[in-house]
UniProtKB/Swiss-Prot annotation, chain A:
SUPFAM superfamilies: Adenine nucleotide alpha hydrolases-like. It is found in: Cytoplasm. GO terms for biological process: protein urmylation; tRNA thio-modification; tRNA wobble uridine modification. This is Cytoplasmic tRNA 2-thiolation protein 2. Pathway: tRNA modification; 5-methoxycarbonylmethyl-2-thiouridine-tRNA biosynthesis. One of its GO terms (cellular component) is cytosol. Keywords: Cytoplasm, tRNA processing. It holds the Pfam family CTU2. Belongs to the CTU2/NCS2 family. Plays a central role in 2-thiolation of mcm(5)S(2)U at tRNA wobble positions of tRNA(Lys), tRNA(Glu) and tRNA(Gln). May act by forming a heterodimer with ctu1/atpbd3 that ligates sulfur from thiocarboxylated urm1 onto the uridine of tRNAs at wobble position. It comes from the Eukaryota. It comes from Xenopus tropicalis (Western clawed frog).
Amino acid sequence: MCEEEEVYCPELQDTTQGKSLGKTCMKCKESSAVLLIRAGDAFCKSCFKEYFVHKFRATLGKNRVIYPGEKVLLAFSGGPSSSAMVQQVQEGMSRDAPKKLRFVPGILFIDEGTTCGMSHEERQQNMSEVQNVLQQTGFPFYIVSLEQVFSLPGSILQRGVPEQRANYKQEVDRFMVQQQAQGETGCSDILENLAKLGVNVSESSRESDKMFQSTCRHPPDTHTQKLIQLFASAKTLTAKHQLLHTLRSHLILHIARTCGYSKVMSGESCTRLSVSLLSNISLGRGAFLPLDTGFCDSRYGDVDIIRPMREYSLKEIAFYNRLFHVSSVFIPALNTKVLENSSIQQLSEVFINRLQADFPSTVSTVYRTSEKLNVSKIDANQGTCAKERCLLCLSPLDTQVGEASAFHATQISHYISQKILMKFNDPANSSGKSCCQEGKCCKGPGYGDFCQPRALQAPSFVDMLCYGCRLTVKDLQSLDALPQYVLHEAEHRSRRIEMRKEIEEFLLDKDEENLH
Amino acid sequence: MRVQWFCFFLSCLTRRVLRGGAELLFDGIKQHQVTLPNQSNPWDIRQLLVWIRHNLLKERPELFIQGDTVRPGILVLINDADWELMGELDYQLEDKDNIVFISTLHGG
């Protein structure tokens, strides 16, 4: 199939040069342009490459969050943006790069085929295709299936302790000195260098790599069934998307933690970020916009998510991949071939793209707005309320707000609209409680559910969530389908809260402590 | 009476992987090489889209074509150059032209 393309190549160049409507590259002002980045900014092929590569390094250089020698996990989905990201890292690592990137990359691919009803064979085919692409990068890679969320530990929902790092410049100096010393001793083994730096790339982690790869081949059927059940229990596509996003982030976090990666690179483009900015506002996640769309997301404490592709539009990425033959793998997802109004996320994407077609500065305007957003004061004093984080997304809870807030208004309206229902059920409820204490149930199984521990737990489970995650959970038919680690952690937390209440009287207040 | 040939790739095309989303609407075929019927006026992209819609699209044409142009979010490359530089819908096709459609939409 590609041969034809090659055969046409010489002719193609002639025709493009003849027909670019006289447009030349705005940078070198010599070659004819192949791509219009913004209105009036036409680039030729070589200037575009330079611009693209420079932007990646500039984004990383400007933000200074990746320390030399640090292990960085590249989250690869197979799509164009993450493929371009992996390629950029490869480019930066290559010998002829003017300033080599100094971190140690690894790649993670999560197979989510189950969520959109793919057969085992189709998934195998996708995975082998991904494997082919990843093998060519030469980086260590992990292929993991989403089913693994069912074997995650509850600790994944606890915030890690951020590693104390010295000043960036000092770290870089130290790294340089170490590298020089290494050069003198003639030892060029990068692994040893890392071991000196205290980064864990031991053989054991290599073994755990193998373990991940082998388990991903055949996820247990029970887990696949559970996953199907979980996604079937979500009533809307919007909730399915959010659920998938949550589970995926937990799995990425887990792999990053177990394999010793302290940074994760996620390949969201600025087009995608503007879409998620709008959809997150609509989903009630406005309080976390700086975390969800910013360059560096440090909500997990020990593992930071960074988004180095956020300066590129999808158009630039698509052109780069096409012009410089970056392989990507197409894998159908939840939103393949769905109606435009099937989910909030889809609708926001259509909205942004339509506006962008008529007003080419839409994406950049929305994106620049997101850049100006800052973490709210809730997160600023995170030291004091570190424990109060959403059970699912681990963002600082946005539900502790004053009486005169939109949140309380919705709570009250929700309560009132339930009141009618409650009245209807009231006798059953009160009698249910009393009879349960006696150890027997006086009502049928339908009413009996009321005094089941799970039903009693439901309100406290919801209390542990942020507003956005509450809406997602509301769209789930039952909480039982959620993976065990979520339920365990919820139980763990509620027990802690209870315990805290019990011993509250004996605890010294911080202010009191200071007085003594 | 000129016979027009062009290769018709769908998706992010690379030497190895020839998939990228939009092909799902075309019966899973990524690359089409078609001969357009002769007509008195030269073919332009606008007419080509109508022709594709009638002859190649297997399902859900609105996911690919909306109005008389492509759905917002689908990029068009004419001989590996941005169609915005080539006059978009008014570009007149020539023999052996190579048109690529790339979907930047999530989910293909």
